[in-house]
């Protein structure tokens, strides 16, 4: 439930627009807004604000989704060189391993 830990928080999908396209766009904008809140929360906790975000996975191939995220978050979003989502996880694991096991 990051960035807001509230088990009583309810969904806000009503009133639903008549247009399925408008409804879908609103859902994507809502998801991007939550992502923005997450970066803001991380900044409150001491992390630097992102200057550029790298995106991976299936959604990274959707230019409309990338544009929505970029506009709402307010930063450049570029497709990662390796677009499989697991690649980032592997890099984080490697980084953690190297930090715990210096040469």
Q: Model-found features: residue ranges?
A:
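Acidic, glycine/GT-rich loop-and beta-edge segments that sit at the periphery of enzyme/chaperone cores
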Residues: 96-103
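Activation-segment/catalytic-loop signature of the eukaryotic protein kinase fold
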Residues: 1-91
